[in-house]
Design a protein with these regions (language model features):
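Structured mid-to-C-terminal alpha-helical surface segments
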Residues: 1-46, 56-271
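Glycine-rich beta-strand-to-loop/alpha-helix junction loops that act as flexible
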Residues: 48-52
Length: 271
């Protein structure tokens, strides 16, 4: 049981590239996903998305992600529903002696998204760490992919994550919505990594692209939007802003990432 103390897990996750706060977040992520994966009924409740999936798929190459994003497949997103979900999580067999409690709940409202941000406290008898979790509700159960966590000493069930095509569209949607004002630098690097490292069906990508943009209230033809996106990524002044924010550990630099995404869009939409 001592091996499941927060302080022991902190030392296990420690890395020169991570700050103490980032190590705590990584420990909490490991505990949260471990508890979910240790109980099949829990594993079937959620669909993982965002940076935590890319961090796992890239075996840490993507860099640190500070939270966890997921959608409920079938669970109420009310405050009462969230409390019951955390209670259920505390009954999971993984990480005995470490309990989770909700410190705060905040509504998340964006252009095409309504969800909740939970601040969770992870505690044992000696220490307490904090992690933020963003939760939405998954609209379609098609295109899900089984996701096996990295091997650990704890037996685990496969989790579910969004498909590669939807993941890529979500990374590109910030550029479609915000255009040259987009400041989500990491989305460009993530999109390039997905294209270069994961299998993408052009047909499924086009379908997901049109569907998700409609959720944003954008009803123009997908080809027209894709062409505009290619033009945006070809603007040197726009990409230059990304160069200034480039941290150096992403697998592809800003210019190369923009070229990778543009080339993919041209092929996918026959531009």
């Amino acid at each position: 049981v001592n091996s499941f103390r927060l302080s022991v897990l902190f030392r296990k996750c420690a890395s020169p590239s991570l700050s103490p706060l980032q190590i705590e977040q990584k420990v909490c992520q490991e505990i949260f996903l471990g508890k979910i994966a240790s109980e099949e009924s829990l594993a079937n409740l959620i669909v993982l998305k965002g940076g935590i999936v890319l961090d796992g798929l890239s075996k840490g190459q993507r860099g640190h992600t500070q939270d966890i994003d997921f959608d409920f497949k079938r669970w109420r997103l009310s405050d009462n529903g969230l409390t019951r979900f955390i209670q259920k999580l505390n009954l999971a067999p993984a990480y005995p002696g470490i309990s989770l409690a909700i410190s705060a709940i905040r509504d998340l409202r964006q252009r095409n998204y309504k969800g909740k941000e939970l601040t969770l406290a992870f505690s044992d008898s000696h220490d307490s760490f904090t992690l933020k979790i963003d939760i939405g509700v998954y609209r379609s159960l098609s295109g899900l992919v089984s996701y096996q966590m990295t091997p650990s000493e704890i037996p685990s069930c496969p989790l579910w994550r969004i498909g590669n095509e939807q993941m890529l569209v979500e990374k590109l949607s910030s550029f479609v919505v915000h255009g040259s004002h987009n400041t989500r630098v990491k989305d460009l690097f993530d999109a390039a990594w997905i294209i270069m490292n994961l299998k993408i069906s052009h047909q499924q990508f086009r379908s997901a692209f049109g569907r998700i943009l409609k959720e944003f209230g954008i009803f123009e033809p997908s080809e027209k939007i894709a062409k505009r996106l290619v033009l945006l990524l070809g603007q040197k002044e726009f990409i230059q802003n990304f160069v200034l924010l480039y941290k150096g550990w992403e697998p592809y630099g800003p210019l190369e990432s923009a070229e990778i995404v543009s080339a993919f869009l041209k092929v996918a939409f026959h531009l």
